[in-house]
């Protein structure tokens, strides 16, 4: 629903893959070779045959300063106006201006579409909530699953071949009274979070102890006229020895104006203050006790040295942009942290909360890997297509061209997703 985070200030943004007016067509400036052929190619080929082929890669590899200079010059040309648009006739420019007006009207319609989509998502969120609430009660042990739910679940896992969840005949015959009754599903949300790739690396051993008391993760959409969403982490405060909060929340805000692609753009996030019971239970800091002796009185006192450390619970204290004049390396580090923070929020909203049981069992990982493999295959296909295109530009032997002569033209293959 939203664009990836814009990590660069607007002043430094450039258009990727600039459209044709920024890269002037060769046919506009020079006579085309398509009909007349390249007048110097045959002569150059004869000279190459006489003196041998120069390997440009070897030359550049042996002269890194030259290579860097070329790269810098090429980089400065990206997005530069070639003058093509400026040289167009007046009546063509007027037509382009009218197209700009029409495009601005399209932006308004797209904004209306996104706003209504947001309202539709919020409408269906109200239908999700009763289901999520029952899920939460079963996880925490406040409610027992109904027999028909168990039977339906058995059919589902059989169809998906998730054999680990199947209850065999011996287990069915076992008397519930003979089996130790476990309240709810222990470590449900901790296990689900640790199976989500983008989150697992942020959870330390100390974090895991705290997340044992996590009872539910909820979602709300903002309805105060500004697009965004809120994640709510509900803890068992009566048993939690680490902090007193019942709920930890994280709110993500989108910009009011749409991005160029017609989607909402991430603006910023706001966390909440965690009321740790004491520094010893605060998993976001490292506590070191030091003894200090007074030189005059010779009295000894104990002081605490507190050092901030990496922790999942830093998620509730999101990174903030301090000023525009900060060091470039610090700016890049901040951008990476902002991008990671935004990605975690989106994946919790779009992946973890709707499919929590599959992240607990690990079944969701199989679908995740399948999607990654499909994307990798598509990237490889595109690279192969590009390679074939380059080969065609270099020219083919007469024998290869004759192989295709006289064959009926085949229809392009349809890719199915």
UniProtKB/Swiss-Prot annotation:
Any S-S bridges, and between which cysteines?
none
Query: What GO molecular function annotation could you give as one example from this UniProt entry?
Result: enzyme activator activity
Q: Where is this region: Interaction with NBA1?
A: 143-362
Which phenotype arises from disrupting this gene? Exhibits a large proportion of multinucleate cells. Elongated buds. The percentage of elongated buds is significantly increased when GIN4 or CKI1 is also deleted. Small decrease in the percentage of cells with elongated buds is observed in NAP1 and CKA2 double mutant. NAP1 and CKI1 double mutant exhibits increased sensitivity to benomyl. Increased resistance to benomyl in NAP1 and CKA2 double mutant.
Origin organism is: Saccharomyces cerevisiae (strain ATCC 204508 / S288c) (Baker's yeast)
Positions with biased composition (Acidic residues): 367-403
Basic and acidic residues composition bias: which ranges?
A: 404-417
Phosphothreonine PTM positions read: 20, 24, 53
Lineage of the native species?
Eukaryota, Fungi, Dikarya, Ascomycota, Saccharomycotina
Q: By what name is this protein known? A: Nucleosome assembly protein
Which compartments does it reside in? Cytoplasm; Nucleus; Bud neck
SUPFAM superfamilies given for it? NAP-like
Which terms under GO biological process does the entry name?
budding cell bud growth; NLS-bearing protein import into nucleus; nucleosome assembly; nucleosome disassembly; positive regulation of microtubule polymerization; positive regulation of transcription elongation by RNA polymerase II; protein localization to cell division site after cytokinesis; ribosomal small subunit biogenesis
The observed outcome of changing residue 99 to S is: Predominantly cytoplasmic
Pfam families named in the record: NAP (PF00956)
């Amino acid at each position: 629903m939203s664009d990836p985070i814009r990590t660069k200030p607007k002043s430094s943004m450039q258009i990727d893959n600039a459209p044709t007016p920024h890269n002037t067509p060769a046919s506009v400036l020079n006579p085309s070779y398509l009909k007349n052929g390249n007048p110097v190619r045959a002569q150059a080929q004869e000279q190459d045959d006489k003196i041998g082929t120069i390997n440009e890669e070897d030359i550049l590899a042996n002269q890194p300063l030259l290579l860097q200079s070329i790269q810098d010059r090429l980089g400065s040309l990206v997005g530069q106006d070639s003058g093509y648009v400026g040289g167009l006739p007046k009546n063509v420019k007027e037509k382009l201006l009218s197209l700009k007006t029409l495009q601005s009207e399209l932006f308004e319609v797209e904004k209306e579409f996104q706003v209504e989509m947001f309202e539709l998502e919020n409408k269906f969120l109200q239908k999700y909530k009763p289901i999520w609430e029952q899920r939460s009660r079963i996880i925490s042990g406040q409610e027992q699953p109904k027999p028909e739910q168990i039977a339906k679940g058995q059919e589902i896992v059989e169809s998906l071949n998730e054999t680990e969840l199947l209850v065999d005949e011996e287990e069915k015959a076992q008397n519930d009274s003979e089996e130790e009754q476990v309240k709810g599903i222990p470590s449900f949300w901790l296990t689900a979070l640790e199976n989500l790739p983008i989150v697992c690396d942020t959870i330390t051993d100390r974090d895991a102890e705290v997340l044992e008391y996590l009872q539910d993760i909820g979602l709300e959409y903002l309805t105060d006229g500004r697009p965004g969403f809120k994640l709510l982490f509900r803890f068992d405060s009566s048993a939690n020895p680490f902090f007193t909060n019942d709920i930890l929340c994280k709110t993500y805000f989108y910009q009011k104006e749409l991005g160029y692609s017609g989607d909402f753009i991430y603006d910023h996030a706001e966390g909440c203050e965690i009321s740790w019971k004491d520094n010893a239970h605060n998993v976001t800091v490292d506590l070191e006790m030091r003894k200090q002796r007074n030189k005059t009185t010779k009295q000894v006192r104990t002081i605490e040295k507190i050092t901030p450390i990496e922790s999942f619970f830093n998620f509730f204290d999101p990174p903030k942009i301090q000023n525009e004049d900060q060091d470039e390396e610090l700016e890049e580090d901040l951008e990476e942290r902002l991008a990671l923070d935004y990605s975690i929020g989106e994946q919790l909203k779009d992946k973890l909360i709707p499919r929590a049981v599959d992240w607990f069992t690990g079944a969701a990982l199989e679908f995740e890997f399948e999607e990654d493999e499909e994307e990798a295959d598509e990237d490889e296909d595109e690279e192969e297509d590009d390679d074939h295109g380059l080969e065609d530009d270099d020219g083919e032997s007469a024998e290869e061209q004759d192989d295709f002569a006289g064959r009926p033209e085949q229809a392009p293959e349809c890719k199915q997703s």
